[in-house]
Amino acid sequence: GKRVVAFYTKEDIDLWNDCCARALAAAGAGPEDVCQVAYGYGLFTGGFGLNGGSQKLGCLTLPMSSGNTDRQLQFMEDLGSTVLCCTPSYAAYLAESIHERGLRDKIHLKAGIFGAEAWSEQMRQDIQKSLGIKAYDIYGLTELSGPGVAYECSAQTGMHINEDHFIAEIIDPDTGEVLPEGTQGELVFTSITKQAFPLLRYRTRDICILRREACPCGRTHIKMCKPMGRSDDMLIVKGVNVFPSQIETVLLEQGYTSNYQIVVDRVNNSDTLDVLVEMTP
């Protein structure tokens, strides 16, 4: 479909940078850190948002953008990057490249902030082990500002939503009825500080759960779980709701899978689901 165009006032950008700075601070980043931002820049919100948050926090900020792995690793080694911001799939690729080139002892990363795509808990564990870091999730969408709507803290038990900027609710995706906290449903947001592009109960299509609970980090903002799928990509096979992310979790737990493809069909009036898996050598 047509690309989403979002608008920002100067104050919107400043508040957005605050939200991203909170995410970085929750991951343990501070003025003494070197933050390598390997999200795309240009019209993509990822690079621009984390770049602003990193600068606001006082980090030495490396605006790398995505791709060019040779340059990424060179800067990571030469400038001593301690925080990495990128997609989880690119983080996994960088980890593989570091291992292949024997650079593990020359890389000093301590934390990573990964988002912009779905990733499983098993993928998190793999990245943490291979890079020797703590990997934190971050959530956002262009319509609300970009990354920084919600973020993980050191407890890694859900993402704190910046409730002073966004009101989160869970609704029934079919009826629109507001559901109580702790119930699975579709996540909707109302922006309360955005000036240029305010939204009222914007439907994200993300399926998750909200929980308000005491957190070891001391933050009191409500938490959202990692999205379990989307209301528009959930698969119903023989009456059972299936999320592709759940299949990914099972496959990655095996430890010997690479790429996979889910094929859903209907044969003789019966639903079928086949998972084609590429095995690692």
PLM feature spans:
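Short, small-residue-enriched loops and turns at beta-alpha junctions
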Residues: D14, Y41-F44, A92
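Conserved ATP-dependent adenylate/AMP-binding module captured primarily in the ANL superfamily
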Residues: W16-V34, N68-S81
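Active-site glycine/GP-rich loop and adjacent strand/helix microenvironment
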Residues: L57-P281
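Conserved AMP-binding loop of ANL adenylate-forming enzymes
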Residues: C20-C59
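Short secondary-structure capping/junction motifs at helix and strand boundaries
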Residues: R3-F7, G28-V34, T61-M64, Y136
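Short, flexible loop segments at the rims of nucleotide/cofactor-binding pockets, characterized by
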Residues: D12-I13, Y39, L60-M64
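Conserved AMP-binding A3 loop
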Residues: G1-L15
